C-alpha cells in the first residue's frame, strides 16, 4: 500500500538530527537563553541553549586546565564564554579597535584573538558579563549576529594593500553579502540589546533560512588574484575577483570547499571548492543567496558529520549544482574567466597603495594580541589606534594591516612601531611567517591536543632542521589544529598537524603553496620526537634535490614522499 504524503513526511522527520528539532522549536533562536543568563546559581546555560547561543555569536566554554582540579573539589567547571564579532572583510576603524581593546580588558581575559576568518574573538567572558559585552560591541557599530551557527558565517575578503580602490569595492561586496544573508529573527536584539519583543512569533518569518536554518555552517570568501590569502578553495562559496583594465568586472565562483572531518570516519574529509562559472559583480549577492538556498534544500539534515555543502556538491555533482543555480537565478552563469594565484600568505611590512597612502602589515604570531613582559603588543596597537586616521584590516593569516596611512602619519606610526619593537616578521623564517594555529587548549571544548600554545616552540625545533638543510629562507606553509574541525585550514598546508590526543598529532604533507591542493596523511598519532625525526630526512632531501623555485609541497609529491591529492574523495585513499 502506498504511503501518504503525511506518512512519508513523518518518516523523514524521524530521521532528522536532534539539532534540527531544537532549531525548529527554538522560537527563532530564542530558546531559554534569557532565562539562563538570569540564573545566578551556575556559570553556565542549558545544553540546548548553548547550541542556540552560537547563532548569536558566542560559545560556552570552560578552562580545561582547571577541569580536573575543580572536579576533585566537586565544583562545576570554570565556565566562561567566547564571543566572536561579525566583521565582514576584516575591516575595522581605529575607534572600533579601541572599543574591542576595552572589552577585552574589562570583560575578557585581557587578550584579543585575530581569527583565521578575519575577525575578533574574546575569551574568558563570565556569564554575568556576557550581555554587557554584547552591548558594548554593538555600541561600536559592530555585532556578533551569525558569527557562529548553521548560517552564513563571517564573509571574508582579501585585505589587498596594493589597489585601495579595488579593495574598497570587494570589501563592500563582502559587507553586502554578509548583511543580505543575515537571519531576520529579532531574537538577537531582544536578548542582548533590550529590543522590543515580538509578542506573536507566528508573525515572524525567516524568508531565506526557514525555521531550521541551514544543515550546517556556511562560509563565503572573496579572493583577489594573485593573492589567495583567504584560501578561496576552502570556502563553501569562493569568489575570485576578476579585474580587467583596473576595473572589477565580476567573480569566478567556486562551490563546495571545506576543511572539517572526523578522525576515523572516512566518509568525512576536507575538500577543495570546484569552479562553477563567472558572474557579473552586480549579480554576486543574488548568486550567493541562491547557492545558499540549494544547500538549505538539498543539504543533509540527518547526519551533521555529512551536512556541509561540500558533501552536497559531491553527492549532486557540480554540473547539477550549476543547473539548479541557473534555474533559481532565471539566467545562466558564464564560463570561468582566466586568473592565476601566486601565493596565499601576507605581504609584510610597509607597502605603498594607490592615491599616496601606505599600509603596514604587522606579523602577529597565531593572531594573539596581548602584552607580555618583553613584548607590549596590545599596548602598542592601542597607541597606534589613538593616532591612526585610516583603518585596521585583519588578515586571513591572523596578521594585522595598519591600512590607509597618510604620508603625514607614516612617520608617527613608524616611531611607535620602533618604540615598542613591533615586527613585520621579515626577521623570521619563511616557515614561521607562514604559520597558523587555532586556539585549542585551554578554552576550546573540541581540542584533543595543544595548538596555539605549542606550535611556536615546535617551529623553533623545525627551524634548526631548516638551517641544517640550508632552506631556512624558503617560504613553507605550516598549520596546526587541536582537532580535525580545521579552523586554521590545515588540510591546505604544505606541513600540517591535526591533534589526536594530548601531545599526539597526525602529520600531513603536500598541500599546495597557493592554497590550491589538499595535503596527504604521512604519519599518524605521533609525538614531537617522531615529528622531528620524520621531517629531518625530507628537509635534507629538499635542500639538496629541489628544483629551482620548487615549493616544499610540490617537492614531497614529486619525490614520492606522499601521493598527490586530487580532491576530497581521495584524501583518505
Swiss-Prot record:
<dbReference type="Pfam" id="PF03460">
    <property type="entry name" value="NIR_SIR_ferr"/>
</dbReference>
<dbReference type="InterPro" id="IPR011786">
    <property type="entry name" value="CysI"/>
</dbReference>
<dbReference type="InterPro" id="IPR006066">
    <property type="entry name" value="NO2/SO3_Rdtase_FeS/sirohaem_BS"/>
</dbReference>
<keyword id="KW-0408">Iron</keyword>
<dbReference type="InterPro" id="IPR045854">
    <property type="entry name" value="NO2/SO3_Rdtase_4Fe4S_sf"/>
</dbReference>
<feature type="binding site">
    <location>
        <position position="438"/>
    </location>
    <ligand>
        <name>[4Fe-4S] cluster</name>
    </ligand>
</feature>
<comment type="pathway">
    <text>Sulfur metabolism; hydrogen sulfide biosynthesis; hydrogen sulfide from sulfite (NADPH route): step 1/1.</text>
</comment>
<dbReference type="InterPro" id="IPR045169">
    <property type="entry name" value="NO2/SO3_Rdtase_4Fe4S_prot"/>
</dbReference>
<keyword id="KW-0411">Iron-sulfur</keyword>
<dbReference type="InterPro" id="IPR036136">
    <property type="entry name" value="Nit/Sulf_reduc_fer-like_dom_sf"/>
</dbReference>
<keyword id="KW-0198">Cysteine biosynthesis</keyword>
<comment type="function">
    <text>Component of the sulfite reductase complex that catalyzes the 6-electron reduction of sulfite to sulfide. This is one of several activities required for the biosynthesis of L-cysteine from sulfate.</text>
</comment>
<dbReference type="GO" id="GO:0000103">
    <property type="term" value="P:sulfate assimilation"/>
</dbReference>
<dbReference type="GO" id="GO:0020037">
    <property type="term" value="F:heme binding"/>
</dbReference>
<dbReference type="Pfam" id="PF01077">
    <property type="entry name" value="NIR_SIR"/>
</dbReference>
<dbReference type="GO" id="GO:0051539">
    <property type="term" value="F:4 iron, 4 sulfur cluster binding"/>
</dbReference>
<dbReference type="InterPro" id="IPR005117">
    <property type="entry name" value="NiRdtase/SiRdtase_haem-b_fer"/>
</dbReference>
<keyword id="KW-0028">Amino-acid biosynthesis</keyword>
<protein>
    <recommendedName>
        <fullName>Sulfite reductase [NADPH] hemoprotein beta-component</fullName>
        <ecNumber>1.8.1.2</ecNumber>
    </recommendedName>
</protein>
<feature type="binding site">
    <location>
        <position position="444"/>
    </location>
    <ligand>
        <name>[4Fe-4S] cluster</name>
    </ligand>
</feature>
<dbReference type="GO" id="GO:0050311">
    <property type="term" value="F:sulfite reductase (ferredoxin) activity"/>
</dbReference>
<dbReference type="GO" id="GO:0009337">
    <property type="term" value="C:sulfite reductase complex (NADPH)"/>
</dbReference>
<dbReference type="GO" id="GO:0046872">
    <property type="term" value="F:metal ion binding"/>
</dbReference>
<dbReference type="GO" id="GO:0070814">
    <property type="term" value="P:hydrogen sulfide biosynthetic process"/>
</dbReference>
<keyword id="KW-0004">4Fe-4S</keyword>
<keyword id="KW-0479">Metal-binding</keyword>
<keyword id="KW-0521">NADP</keyword>
<dbReference type="GO" id="GO:0050661">
    <property type="term" value="F:NADP binding"/>
</dbReference>
<comment type="similarity">
    <text>Belongs to the nitrite and sulfite reductase 4Fe-4S domain family.</text>
</comment>
<dbReference type="InterPro" id="IPR006067">
    <property type="entry name" value="NO2/SO3_Rdtase_4Fe4S_dom"/>
</dbReference>
<keyword id="KW-0560">Oxidoreductase</keyword>
<feature type="binding site">
    <location>
        <position position="483"/>
    </location>
    <ligand>
        <name>[4Fe-4S] cluster</name>
    </ligand>
</feature>
<feature type="binding site" description="axial binding residue">
    <location>
        <position position="487"/>
    </location>
    <ligand>
        <name>siroheme</name>
    </ligand>
</feature>
<comment type="subunit">
    <text>Alpha(8)-beta(8). The alpha component is a flavoprotein, the beta component is a hemoprotein.</text>
</comment>
<dbReference type="GO" id="GO:0004783">
    <property type="term" value="F:sulfite reductase (NADPH) activity"/>
</dbReference>
<keyword id="KW-0349">Heme</keyword>
<dbReference type="GO" id="GO:0019344">
    <property type="term" value="P:cysteine biosynthetic process"/>
</dbReference>
<feature type="binding site">
    <location>
        <position position="487"/>
    </location>
    <ligand>
        <name>[4Fe-4S] cluster</name>
    </ligand>
</feature>
Amino acid at each position: 500500500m502506498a504511503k501518504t504524503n503525511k506518512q512519508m513526511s513523518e518518516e523523514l522527520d524521524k530521521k532528522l538530527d536532534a539539532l534540527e528539532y531544537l532549531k525548529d522549536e527554538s522560537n527563532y533562536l530564542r530558546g531559554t537563553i534569557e532565562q539562563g543568563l538570569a540564573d545566578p546559581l551556575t556559570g553556565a546555560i542549558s545544553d540546548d541553549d548553548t547550541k542556540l547561543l552560537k547563532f548569536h555569536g558566542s560559545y560556552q566554554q570552560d578552562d580545561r586546565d582547571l577541569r580536573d582540579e575543580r572536579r576533585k573539589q566537586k565544583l562545576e567547571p570554570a565556565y566562561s564564554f567566547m564571543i566572536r564579532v561579525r566583521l565582514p572583510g576584516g575591516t575595522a576603524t581605529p575607534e572600533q579597535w579601541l572599543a574591542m581593546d576595552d572589552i577585552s580588558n574589562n570583560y575578557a581575559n585581557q587578550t584579543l584573538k585575530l581569527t583565521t576568518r578575519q575577525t575578533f574573538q574574546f575569551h574568558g567572558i563570565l556569564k554575568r558579563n556576557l550581555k554587557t559585552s554584547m552591548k558594548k560591541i554593538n555600541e561600536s557599530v559592530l555585532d556578533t549576529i551569525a558569527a557562529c551557527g548553521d548560517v552564513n558565517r563571517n564573509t571574508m575578503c582579501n585585505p589587498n594593500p596594493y589597489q585601495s580602490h579595488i579593495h574598497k569595492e570587494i570589501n563592500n561586496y563582502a559587507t553586502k553579502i554578509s548583511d543580505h544573508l543575515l537571519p531576520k529573527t529579532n531574537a538577537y536584539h531582544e536578548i542582548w540589546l533590550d529590543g522590543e519583543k515580538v509578542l506573536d512569533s507566528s508573525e515572524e518569518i525567516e524568508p531565506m533560512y526557514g525555521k531550521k536554518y541551514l544543515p550546517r555552517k556556511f562560509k563565503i570568501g572573496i579572493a583577489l588574484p594573485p593573492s589567495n590569502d583567504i584560501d578561496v578553495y576552502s570556502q563553501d562559496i569562493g569568489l575570485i575577483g576578476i579585474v580587467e583594465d583596473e576595473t572589477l568586472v565580476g567573480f569566478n565562483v567556486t562551490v563546495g570547499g571545506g576543511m572539517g572531518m572526523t578522525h576515523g570516519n572516512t566518509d568525512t574529509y576536507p575538500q577543495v571548492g570546484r569552479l562553477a562559472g563567472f558572474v557579473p559583480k552586480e549579480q554576486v549577492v543574488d548568486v550567493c543567496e541562491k547557492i545558499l538556498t540549494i544547500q538549505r534544500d538539498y543539504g543533509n539534515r540527518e547526519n551533521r558529520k555529512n551536512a556541509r555543502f561540500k558533501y552536497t556538491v559531491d553527492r549532486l555533482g557540480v554540473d547539477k549544482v550549476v543547473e539548479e543555480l541557473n534555474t533559481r537565478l532565471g539566467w545562466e552563469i558564464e564560463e570561468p574567466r582566466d586568473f592565476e594565484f601566486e601565493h596565499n600568505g601576507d605581504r609584510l611590512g610597509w607597502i605603498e597603495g594607490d592615491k599616496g597612502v601606505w599600509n603596514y602589515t604587522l606579523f602577529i604570531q597565531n593572531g594573539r594580541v596581548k602584552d607580555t613582559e618583553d613584548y607590549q603588543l596590545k599596548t602598542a596597537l592601542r597607541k597606534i589606534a589613538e593616532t591612526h586616521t585610516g583603518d585596521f584590516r585583519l588578515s586571513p593569516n591572523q596578521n594585522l594591516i595598519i591600512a590607509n596611512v597618510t604620508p603625514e602619519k607614516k612617520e608617527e606610526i613608524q616611531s611607535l612601531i620602533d618604540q615598542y619593537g613591533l615586527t613585520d616578521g621579515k626577521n623570521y623564517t619563511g616557515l614561521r611567517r607562514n604559520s597558523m594555529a587555532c586556539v585549542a587548549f585551554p578554552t576550546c571544548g573540541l581540542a584533543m591536543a595543544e595548538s596555539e600554545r605549542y606550535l611556536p616552540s615546535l617551529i623553533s625545533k623545525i627551524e634548526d632542521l631548516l638551517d641544517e638543510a640550508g632552506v631556512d629562507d624558503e617560504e613553507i606553509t605550516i598549520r596546526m589544529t587541536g582537532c580535525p574541525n580545521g579552523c586554521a585550514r590545515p588540510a591546505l598546508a604544505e606541513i600540517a598537524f591535526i591533534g589526536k590526543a594530548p601531545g599526539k598529532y597526525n602529520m600531513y604533507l603536500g598541500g599546495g603553496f597557493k592554497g590550491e591542493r589538499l595535503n596527504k596523511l604521512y604519519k599518524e598519532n605521533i609525538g614531537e620526537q617522531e615529528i622531528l625525526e620524520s621531517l629531518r630526512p625530507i628537509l635534507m632531501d629538499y635542500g639538496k634535490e629541489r628544483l629551482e623555485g620548487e615549493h616544499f609541497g610540490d617537492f614531497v609529491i614529486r619525490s614520492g614522499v606522499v601521493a598527490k591529492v586530487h580532491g576530497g574523495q581521495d584524501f583518505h585513499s
